[in-house]
């Protein structure tokens, strides 16, 4: 990335009232614009994000994280941004790591930098640690380039490399599918260490259901290649 890049932070959010406002304020304090896609939340997620200084787009119904990110990328393009950083809205991704992620993107020059939580994964719930490592290993084999933490949603993307068509997977598997698409096109993918803040709230990720969706996505791609 260049020092003159115009960058915004995009946050897909579903039922994040009570958390999203603090995330947006922490990002805005660093001088970055924020686009939040309220993915059909029944609570005050969108209102809290707007009050904290974000541009808020809303899906009338819950369409999934992949669909929300696609909406955010389209908005960033329309507003002339060169690159985006994706973050979760629940506070797990520490906005204090934004400068480090941007510095890594400048250092590597890669159009994609994926956060790596695995260097300090002790606080990660054990099941998620195992599934993350397994998915990252499998994706790395298919991609033919190693990304230590393919399941981390704290990422830097240059918009020019992102597809403009909607993702085949609209939920959590969409981020893995995107990495596969980028690797297939020969796009370099770098990594940068980031922290994750785990709280007592139940994760929206279902290890069984979302792992099955991930495997289903991998199977569909394998069938299409034959």
Residue positions per predicted region:
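Short hydrophobic beta-strand elements that form part
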Residues: 8-12, 58
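Short, well-formed alpha-helical segments that are part of the catalytic scaffolds
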Residues: 13-29
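Cell-envelope/extracellular polymer assembly enzymes that use nucleotide-activated donors
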Residues: 6-8, 177
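Acidic helix N-cap motif at the loop->helix transition within catalytic regions
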Residues: 18-22, 43-52
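Catalytic donor-sugar/metal-binding loop of nucleotide-sugar-dependent glycosyltransferases
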Residues: 145-146, 167-170, 179-196
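A conserved acidic beta->alpha catalytic loop
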Residues: 38-47, 91
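Short beta-strand-to-loop acidic/aromatic patch adjacent to the donor-nucleotide binding site
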Residues: 81-92
């Amino acid at each position: 990335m260049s020092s003159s890049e115009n960058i915004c932070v995009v946050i897909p959010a579903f039922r994040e009232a009570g958390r999203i406002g603090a995330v947006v304020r922490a990002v805005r304090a660093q001088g970055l614009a924020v686009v939040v896609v309220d993915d059909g939340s029944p609570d005050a997620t969108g209102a809290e994000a707007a009050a904290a200084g974000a541009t808020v787009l809303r899906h009338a119904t819950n369409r999934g994280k992949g669909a929300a990110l696609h909406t955010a990328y389209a908005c960033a393009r329309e507003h002339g941004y060169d690159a985006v950083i994706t973050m979760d809205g629940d506070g797990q991704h520490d906005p204090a790591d934004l400068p480090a992620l941007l510095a890594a993107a400048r250092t590597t020059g890669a159009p994609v930098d994926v956060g790596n939580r695995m260097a300090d994964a002790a606080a990660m719930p054990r099941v998620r640690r195992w599934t993350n490592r397994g998915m990252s290993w499998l994706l790395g084999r298919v991609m033919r380039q190693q990304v230590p933490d393919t399941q981390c949603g704290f990422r830097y993307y240059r918009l020019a490399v992102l597809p403009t068509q909607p993702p085949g997977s609209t939920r959590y598997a969409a981020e893995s599918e995107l990495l596969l698409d980028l690797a297939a096109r020969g796009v370099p993918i770098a990594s940068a260490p980031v922290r994750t803040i785990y709280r007592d709230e139940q994760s929206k990720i279902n290890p069984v259901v979302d792992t099955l969706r991930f495997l289903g996505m991998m199977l569909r791609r394998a069938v299409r290649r034959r």
